[in-house]
C-alpha cells in the first residue's frame, strides 16, 4: 500500500469515519487529498444489501455517465460485413474478426472495451481465457454482445461504465476526475445509483443501498449521505 502524504494524513484526521457527509462536502475533502500530479480519478464504492455468493443476487450492468469519465475509451469490435462498417462509422478504434482474434492471442490489446456482434461470438468465445481475467469479455448483460454495435460503440465512447458487485457486496466505479466540478460528479454518481437501483435483485431483502463512499485514486474514502446524491 502506498504511503500517505503529510496532507493526506492530516485529512485522514479530519474525516470522521462514523459521519455521513453531504456529497459536496465529501467531494471537497476528497479533492483536498488528491495531491498527485496527474488528474486523479474520483471513485465510488457502494455497499449493497445483497449476498453476492448467490447467483440470483449478482448485481451487474452498465450505465452511460452523463458527464463522461474524463478518459478516452478505446473500443475494439468483433464484427463482419455491414456490422463492421457500422462499428467503424460509430467511431470504433479497431474492427475485425479472425485477424483481431490473432492480435489478441499475440497479446496486442490496445483497447479498453470489447464489443461483439452475436455472430462473432464463435470467434470471441475462443478468447475467454485472455479477455475474461482482464474484464474485457463481451457480455449481453452489459450490452457488449449486441446486434446494435453502433450504439454500443457510441455508449462506450460517451463514458459508459460497467459495474459488477464483488464478493463482499460492493460495487466499485469511477464517476469522473478531480478536474470535474461538483455538479458533474454528482450527476454521474446519481446516474450510477439509479442504474444500481434498477438492477436490484428481486430476492434482495432489507436495506439495499447501505453505504456510499467517495475517494480519489490515492486518497482516503469519505462516506456520503445518500439523501444528498440526487442530481
Swiss-Prot record:
Gene3D superfamilies in the cross-refs: 3.30.190.20, 3.40.50.790
Keywords: Repressor, Ribonucleoprotein, Ribosomal protein, RNA-binding, rRNA-binding, Translation regulation, tRNA-binding
Gene Ontology molecular-function annotations: rRNA binding; structural constituent of ribosome; tRNA binding
InterPro entries, sorted: Ribosom_uL1_bac-type, Ribosomal_uL1, Ribosomal_uL1-like, Ribosomal_uL1/biogenesis, Ribosomal_uL1_3-a/b-sand, Ribosomal_uL1_CS
Pfam families with a match to the protein in the record: Ribosomal_L1
Alphabetical GO biological process terms: regulation of translation; translation
S-S bonds: none
Membrane spanning stretches: none
GO cellular component: cytosolic large ribosomal subunit
Subunit structure comment from the entry: Part of the 50S ribosomal subunit.
HAMAP family: Ribosomal_uL1_B (MF_01318_B)
Family annotation (PANTHER family): 54S RIBOSOMAL PROTEIN L1, MITOCHONDRIAL, LARGE RIBOSOMAL SUBUNIT PROTEIN UL1M
Similarity-based family: Belongs to the universal ribosomal protein uL1 family.
Protein's job: Binds directly to 23S rRNA. The L1 stalk is quite mobile in the ribosome, and is involved in E site tRNA release.
Record protein name field: Large ribosomal subunit protein uL1
Source organism of this protein record: Acidovorax ebreus (strain TPSY) (Diaphorobacter sp. (strain TPSY))
Amino acid at each position: 500500500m502506498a504511503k500517505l502524504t503529510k496532507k493526506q494524513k492530516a485529512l485522514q484526521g479530519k474525516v470522521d469515519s462514523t459521519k455521513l457527509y453531504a456529497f459536496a462536502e465529501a467531494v471537497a475533502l476528497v479533492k483536498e487529498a488528491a495531491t498527485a500530479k496527474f488528474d486523479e480519478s474520483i471513485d465510488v464504492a457502494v455497499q449493497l444489501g445483497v449476498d453476492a455468493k448467490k447467483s440470483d443476487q449478482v448485481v451487474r450492468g452498465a450505465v452511460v455517465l452523463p458527464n463522461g469519465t474524463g478518459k478516452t475509451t478505446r473500443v475494439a469490435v468483433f464484427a463482419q460485413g455491414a456490422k463492421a462498417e457500422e462499428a467503424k462509422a460509430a467511431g470504433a478504434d479497431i474492427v475485425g474478426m479472425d485477424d483481431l482474434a490473432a492480435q489478441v492471442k499475440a497479446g496486442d490489446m490496445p483497447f479498453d472495451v470489447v464489443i461483439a456482434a452475436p455472430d462473432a461470438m464463435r470467434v470471441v468465445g475462443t478468447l475467454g481465457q485472455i479477455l475474461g481475467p482482464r474484464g474485457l469479455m463481451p457480455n449481453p448483460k452489459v450490452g457488449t454482445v449486441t446486434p446494435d454495435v453502433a450504439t454500443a460503440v457510441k455508449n462506450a465512447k460517451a463514458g459508459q461504465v460497467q459495474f459488477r458487485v464483488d464478493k463482499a457486496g460492493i460495487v466499485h466505479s469511477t464517476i469522473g476526475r478531480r478536474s470535474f466540478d461538483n455538479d458533474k460528479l454528482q450527476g454521474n454518481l446519481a446516474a450510477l445509483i439509479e442504474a444500481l437501483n434498477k438492477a436490484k435483485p428481486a430476492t434482495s431483502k432489507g436495506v439495499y443501498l447501505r453505504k456510499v463512499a467517495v475517494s480519489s485514486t490515492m486518497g482516503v474514502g469519505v462516506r456520503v449521505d445518500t439523501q444528498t446524491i440526487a442530481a
